[in-house]
Design a protein with these regions (language model features):
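Eukaryotic helix-grip
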Residues: 54-64, 90-92, 96-104, 138, ...
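Generic recognition of short, well-ordered alpha-helical interface segments
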Residues: 38, 45-48, 90, 156-159, ...
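A short, structured loop/turn motif at beta-sheet edges
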Residues: 37-41, 96-102, 122-132, 170-174
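Structured, soluble extracytoplasmic/luminal domains of envelope-associated proteins
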Residues: 79-126
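Beta-strand/loop substructures that line and gate deep hydrophobic ligand-binding cavities in soluble
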Residues: 106-162, 168-170
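Charged, low-complexity, helix/coiled-coil-prone segments
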Residues: 35-40, 60-68, 100-117, 170
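Hydrophobic ligand-binding cavity/cleft-lining segments
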Residues: 4-74
Length: 174
């Protein structure tokens, strides 16, 4: 009888979590900015040329021995950075579009779970030879687990974007 109560409580908890997930956001949006003491073109080149990516991105810094591969022409649509590691999983970042002030990437995660996101970068002249860099990312949070984990995803990405922009700032200003 006790086992039946425990099983009933577990089923009830699952039903409650599924119900809560119905009302949670089905996507996320992150935006962080930083001022870098270098001209706009210089900073934009360090983001749009993925040969520099491992030097400043916060995920690569966590697993420096991970495998990576860069294909395509720098600063051109189709330019791609792929990675594979035990800690950072596997995926790719592909330049989708670029203009004078923006760089847009498609982000695809393969491991530990499949997901897609969009990365957008805005570069604005700011003061004397300074650049305001804005990094945006948005993606879907699938029902139910993605939605239930949405708060943690958002919180972790906020921290990682701050770390990434600080790394980019140090890399550009050295």
């Amino acid at each position: 009888m006790t086992l039946l109560y425990i099983l009933g409580a577990i089923v009830m908890l699952i039903v409650i979590l599924l119900f809560i997930a119905l009302f949670l956001p089905n996507g996320y949006f992150i935006e962080k900015s930083a001022i870098i003491k270098k001209p706009c073109n210089f900073v934009m080149d360090r983001v749009a040329d993925l040969h520099y990516y491992a030097q400043w991105n916060p995920w690569q810094q966590k697993e420096k021995n991970s495998e990576s591969n860069i294909t395509g022409l720098p600063k051109r649509p189709g330019h791609r950075y792929s990675w594979k590691g035990k800690k950072i999983g596997a995926g790719s970042l592909t330049l989708r579009d670029i203009d004078e002030k923006h760089v847009h990437f498609d982000l695809e995660f393969i491991k530990p779970w499949k997901a897609r996101a969009r990365d957008n970068w805005l570069f604005e002249e700011w003061g004397n030879d300074e650049t305001k860099v804005t990094w945006q990312d948005f993606g879907a949070l699938p029902y139910p687990m993605g939605r239930l984990m949405g708060y943690m995803v958002h919180k972790n990405l906020q921290r990682q974007f701050t770390e990434g922009l600080n790394n980019l700032k140090r890399f550009c200003e050295m």
